[in-house]
Amino acid sequence: MKPGIHPEYGPVVFRDRSTGTQFLTRSTATSEERVEWSDGNSYPLIVVDVTSASHPFWTGGRQVLDTQGRVEKFRRRYGDRARGGQ
């Protein structure tokens, strides 16, 4: 790889918002928020809505996610225009 043009790639903890499950992996994503991991080190924390711990495809079940906030945000942003301008 050419030096100086690629983002830094390091350890990051991803936390599933709905289940609280945490995954330590590597990513170019960063965060100011940090979390203490079981190895005693502190890593950047990124909170995500869906992971393999909560997605129905991976869990084999059906889990209702909180989409009310998304729907309300959409309605505030687009209002009646979303219904075809009626």
Swiss-Prot record:
One GO cellular component term noted in the UniProt record for this chain: ribonucleoprotein complex
Family the entry assigns: Belongs to the bacterial ribosomal protein bL31 family. Type B subfamily.
Organism encoding this protein: Saccharopolyspora erythraea (strain ATCC 11635 / DSM 40517 / JCM 4748 / NBRC 13426 / NCIMB 8594 / NRRL 2338)
Cited InterPro entries: Ribosomal_bL28/bL31-like_sf, Ribosomal_bL31, Ribosomal_bL31_B, Ribosomal_bL31_sf
Biological process terms in GO annotation: translation
Keywords: Ribonucleoprotein, Ribosomal protein
PROSITE patterns in the cross-refs: RIBOSOMAL_L31 (PS01143)
GO molecular function: structural constituent of ribosome
Subunit and partners: Part of the 50S ribosomal subunit.
Lineage top rank: taxon: Bacteria
Record carries keyword Ribonucleoprotein: yes
Official protein name in the record: Large ribosomal subunit protein bL31B
